[in-house]
Design a protein with these regions (language model features):
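CBM-like, beta-strand-rich accessory domains located in the C-terminal region of large
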Residues: 1-155
Length: 155
C-alpha cells in the first residue's frame, strides 16, 4: 500500500498498530499524523510524521522522521493506476484516459522502481482493471533524521 518501509520493515497489521497525533487543519488544507506507531519495534522508528497538504495546483506529501537506529534503506511506496512513465529522473508521469499528473520526488535522494501487481480479487479488478503498479522510491542514503517531500501536479 502507500505507506513506507521504514528501515526495511513494513507497517504491522492489527488494531494496536495505527497512526497517532492525527491533526486536520482545514484552514491550511492539511492532514498530518505520526505513522511510527503503525510499525513494530524492530522498525526502530522514533517519529515519522506524514503530512498531506492540498494547494491550488498540487497535493504535497511530506515525511519528517527520526530513527532510533539505522538498519536498512527507507522505501516510500505509492500505488498507481494508469500508464506510468519513469523516463525523467525526479518525475513520474501518470496518464489515465487523457488526464495526466506528475509525481515529483528528489532524484538525489531516491532510486525509483516499478512493480506490476495483478488484481485477482473481483472487488478490486472491477474498479481498477487487471493491474495496478507499486512505485517504490528507495533512499540512496541511510540517515537517522530527515525529510522527504513529494508533490503531485496535474498537467
Amino acid at each position: 500500500h502507500n505507506l513506507p518501509m521504514i528501515n526495511g520493515v513494513p507497517q504491522k497489521f492489527g488494531s494496536e498498530y495505527k497512526a497517532t497525533d492525527v491533526v486536520l487543519d482545514k484552514k491550511k488544507k492539511q492532514l498530518s499524523m505520526n505513522i511510527a506507531t503503525a510499525y513494530p519495534d524492530n522498525a526502530e522508528v522514533e517519529k515519522w510524521i506524514r503530512t498531506y497538504r492540498l494547494r491550488d495546483s498540487s497535493l504535497d506529501i511530506s515525511d519528517d522522521f527520526i530513527l532510533k537506529k539505522l538498519k536498512n534503506e527507507n522505501q516510500v511506496n505509492f500505488l498507481l493506476w494508469g500508464d506510468i512513465d519513469l523516463n525523467t529522473a525526479g518525475k513520474v508521469k501518470i496518464s489515465v484516459e487523457g488526464q495526466i499528473v506528475e509525481l515529483h520526488y528528489d532524484k538525489s535522494l531516491f532510486t525509483p522502481s516499478l512493480e506490476t501487481i495483478l488484481l485477482t480479487d473481483p472487488r478490486l479488478s472491477n474498479v481498477w482493471g487487471e493491474k495496478i503498479f507499486r512505485l517504490s522510491l528507495t533512499a540512496k542514503k541511510m540517515v537517522e533524521k530527515g525529510r522527504y517531500v513529494f508533490s503531485v501536479k496535474a498537467l
